[in-house]
Amino acid sequence: EKIPGGAEAAYRELSKHLKADGMDVEILTTCVREFASDWSRNVYKPGTEVVGGVPVRRFRAASRDRAAFDRVNARLIRHQSVSRQEEELFFREMINSPDLYRYIAGHASDYHCFIHIPYPFGTTYYGVLACPEKSMLIPCLHDEGYAHLSGVREIFEKVRGIVFLSRPEEELARRLYDIEGTKRQ
């Protein structure tokens, strides 16, 4: 409830609406407080609690090399190209939770789908790869350096479906990725 951010607010509202419509909803997330906090500092305890009527299952975030991430991220912010190794470092040293990805892969049959929002985070990237056939993406896509990463292309092209928040967002995705076979809303 108290976590700021546009994508977080959108997901919170979506969860409440789905729950109100009678769907079983559970949020899978990390123990990190918010986007602006230290991504390797686990503030919340791992486990499940009910927040605003919706179960929230939290997983420990991994430690990370912030300086290495910041070096690559600075280049991406300036729309500079990065090597495949730097791209892998970007996803690896961003906010991550191997426990979360193992849970998704090991409990996929317990869920109808996994909704990932927004696109450029380690939790989205590795979460989609853990179970692409049940992954839905709400990308919040912008024409920025992150959008041009091959790993981002990979998840856009592997997910079961994509929900775009605007027509320009969908048009950008169509220009950047091969999403013709992906269900879109």
Where in this protein do the model-derived segments appear?
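A short acidic, amphipathic alpha-helical/loop segment
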Residues: Y126-A130, S150-E154, L176
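Conserved nucleotide-sugar donor-binding subdomain of glycosyltransferases
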Residues: A67-G122
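A short, active-site helix/loop in glycosyltransferases that binds the activated sugar's phosphate group
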Residues: D143-A147, V159-R184
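A conserved, positively charged/aromatic
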Residues: S135-C140, Y146-R160
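N-terminal subdomain of nucleotide-sugar transferases
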Residues: E1-R57, S109
